[in-house]
């Protein structure tokens, strides 16, 4: 959000609506409440709207769970799991996810912050919590290596046996000291080579329990393009201000 702010500000000052794919923009108030308020004020002054969206965050691990909760009288816990393949992605993603690194180099990258892993858990947790009326008192996330036992090669990535084929991201949102939102997101190149099948899964504990399974995964690249394009008319027709997927049809 902070890195994207100046670009968004420039566009808004030209009286143009903005749809951003920056992950943190999906629910920027989760980590940047003051900057979010500034963007909202700026958008209203110029009569335009700002929205951040994508496939994840933006749909598969947040909005979809929120929509599914609409058939429930009581929600006790939300678990979202997205198992996806990194194979279609290019060199930048391979580097961000640590594909091809030794385990030691991967762990060093996690410690010094040079590996991005998945970005957006804080925003997804914040969006779900806002929709369900929960107050998150603690958020945590973890990042661990997925080590391959066979050589794996994708168009832009290579990991030899014993090295890192991807990253397993996990995150938790706590309410009153209890994990109420659980996020699990393993992503790797050529997952099928070791029997891992991609998919999107949501479990909502409560009354009645909801268990959703989509296999294979919803394609991240095409899905993000579709989300952005499909939201354009809604952003154009929205009242001015900073919006999230909770605000729009």
Could you say what each language-model-derived stretch is?
Residues 59-71:
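Alpha-helical support elements that line or immediately flank enzyme active sites
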Residues 53-58, 220:
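Active-site nucleophile and cofactor-binding loops and adjacent substrate-binding regions
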């Amino acid at each position: 959000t902070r890195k994207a702010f100046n670009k968004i500000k420039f566009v808004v000052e030209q009286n143009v609506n903005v749809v951003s794919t920056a992950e943190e923009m999906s629910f920027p108030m989760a980590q940047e409440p003051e900057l979010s308020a500034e963007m909202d004020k700026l958008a209203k002054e110029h009569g335009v709207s700002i929205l951040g969206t994508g496939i994840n965050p933006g749909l598969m691990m947040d909005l979809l769970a929120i929509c599914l909760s609409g058939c429930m009288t009581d929600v006790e816990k939300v678990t979202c799991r997205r198992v996806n393949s990194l194979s279609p992605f290019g060199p930048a993603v391979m580097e961000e996810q640590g594909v091809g690194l030794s385990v030691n180099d991967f762990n060093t990258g996690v410690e010094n912050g040079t590996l991005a892993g998945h970005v957006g858990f804080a925003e997804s947790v914040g969006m779900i919590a806002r929709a369900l009326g929960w107050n998150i008192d603690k958020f945590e996330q973890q990042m661990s290596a997925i080590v391959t036992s066979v050589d794996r090669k994708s168009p832009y990535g290579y990991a030899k046996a014993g090295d890192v084929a991807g990253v397993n991201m996990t995150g938790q949102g706590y309410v009153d000291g209890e994990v109420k939102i659980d996020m699990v997101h393993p992503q790797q190149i050529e997952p099928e080579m070791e029997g891992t099948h991609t998919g999107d899964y949501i479990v909502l504990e409560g009354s009645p329990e909801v268990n959703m399974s989509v296999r294979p995964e919803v394609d991240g690249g095409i899905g993000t393009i579709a989300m952005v394009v499909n939201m354009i008319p809604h952003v154009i027709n929205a009242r001015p201000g900073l919006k999230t997927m909770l605000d729009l049809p």
